[in-house]
Amino acid sequence: MAQEFSRTERVRHQLQREIAMILQREIKDPRVSMVTVSDVEVSRDLAYAKVFVTFFQDDPEQTKQALKVLNEASGFIRSLLGKRIKARIVPQLRFQHDASLNEGIRMGKLVAEARERDKKSSENSGDD
């Protein structure tokens, strides 16, 4: 069982690396610029992979369009993967937006705002 897990992990990391390189060097569509592969989840049988990506732009409409382009190009990306990795099965790819980065930034801003409010509140109450 542990051997299967390590193989899945190796494949997952290799897919993440190779897909990132393919997106950076091979995909020339201007709607898919500044994309980062943040994670890859692979099924136990290695037949399917969810590719989580983040984009530099914050516009939800551009993100939606870029995801559509990536999912439409998944067959092409899969064929390029087949040439780069030594695997009997190259998984079918499904691209999904990874909102965790944006959510982390939003949470960080909320914490900073709360600290600032607390600081001002304690300064004002100390003046009494």
Curated annotation (Swiss-Prot):
GO terms for biological process: maturation of SSU-rRNA. InterPro entries: KH_dom-like_a/b, RbfA, RbfA_dom_sf. It is found in: Cytoplasm. GO terms for cellular component: cytosol. It comes from the Bacteria. One of its GO terms (molecular function) is ribosomal small subunit binding. The keyword Cytoplasm applies. It holds the Pfam family RBFA. Keywords: Cytoplasm, Ribosome biogenesis. One of several proteins that assist in the late maturation steps of the functional core of the 30S ribosomal subunit. Associates with free 30S ribosomal subunits (but not with 30S subunits that are part of 70S ribosomes or polysomes). Required for efficient processing of 16S rRNA. May interact with the 5'-terminal helix region of 16S rRNA. Belongs to the RbfA family. Monomer. Binds 30S ribosomal subunits, but not 50S ribosomal subunits or 70S ribosomes. This is Ribosome-binding factor A. The lineage of its organism: Bacteria, Pseudomonadati, Pseudomonadota, Gammaproteobacteria, Alteromonadales.
